[in-house]
Amino acid sequence: MDSNSNNTKSIKRKVVDQLVEGYEFATQLQLLLSHQHSNQYHIDETRLVSGSGSVSGGPDPVDELMSKILGSFHKTISVLDSFDPVAVSVPIAVEGSWNASCGDDSATPVSCNGGDSGESKKKRLGVGKGKRGCYTRKTRSHTRIVEAKSSEDRYAWRKYGQKEILNTTFPRSYFRCTHKPTQGCKATKQVQKQDQDSEMFQITYIGYHTCTANDQTHAKTEPFDQEIIMDSEKTLAASTAQNHVNAMVQEQENNTSSVTAIDAGMVKEEQNNNGDQSKDYYEGSSTGEDLSLVWQETMMFDDHQNHYYCGETSTTSHQFGFIDNDDQFSSFFDSYCADYERTSAM
């Protein structure tokens, strides 16, 4: 435990020393550049006399200071590489600025690689032992996420895969547009149940549909729906008309029953007046029965009522359905009354 603490203190001391040294070199460079403008004429004259690129024939002081500054920072980076707690965060940022100044190999005594070993590179990249590097797939298409109680929508999909997702309860299903092989539609979606609510789906749509089959299907079904509506209206109208006709038929049947009852009462009254003989004869007469049947069976819809009188007996008659005019009806009814009177007289 004590050895680790001493090692940490030693590393910190080295880092501080290298940073202080680099700061001093940077200060000297600043002073040199500030006085360079005032001494520019003298330096150029000296270079012409000596025929070299420096005042004393040695290296340029600016290049020398730059080399020292870069070397100091390089040593600091090397020290930080051996110190695990800061090896992940600090060296990466410093390495980027350090590599940016490695454009000129002649002006920098330290190589851009810096003699780094494989372990130091792994530490700077943040890849430790026993860990797998993570990557994120770039999604170039438009992506939108929705939550719904059903995974179905108005498009046709084909499932092409499913896999388990880490730290989730339900698997994720992958779908593509059914018309991709025929029309090249690249729309896809991912469906997964939510862990908090298993009845809810989280649907991720990637891309847009470019197929036209769905639009054509919708266009074909739209007139079919209108036909259903029109057929329903026709059925309703036909049903209403049928009910009206049934009501009229029922009314006519009621009227026929009432007229038949009136005729039966009149016949009974005549029978009582003429005695039992005429009654028996009338009941045995086939002509009276036939005419009574004809009267009941031929009664149809009436447009108006006509009154006819035969002696002291009067009756109300309805127009027959098979009689075209009033003259035919009158002759038919007169013959009926004559037969009825002959039967009663006998």
Curated annotation (Swiss-Prot):
Give the induction note.
Answer: Induced by reactive oxygen species (ROS) and salicylic acid (SA). Early but transient accumulation after osmotic stress (e.g. polyethylene glycol, PEG). Up-regulated by E.amylovora.
Describe, from its UniProt entry, the tissues in which this protein is expressed. Expressed in leaves.
Extract the DNA-binding region annotation as residue ranges. Answer: 146-214
Q: Which is an annotated GO molecular function term of this record?
A: DNA-binding transcription factor activity
On modification after translation, the UniProt record reads: Phosphorylated and destabilized by ASK7/BIN2.
Q: What is this protein called?
A: Probable WRKY transcription factor 54
| Compositional bias per record (Basic residues), positions renumbered to this chain | 121-130
Q: Which UniProt keywords apply?
A: Brassinosteroid signaling pathway, DNA-binding, Ethylene signaling pathway, Jasmonic acid signaling pathway, Nucleus, Phosphoprotein, Plant defense, Transcription, Transcription regulation
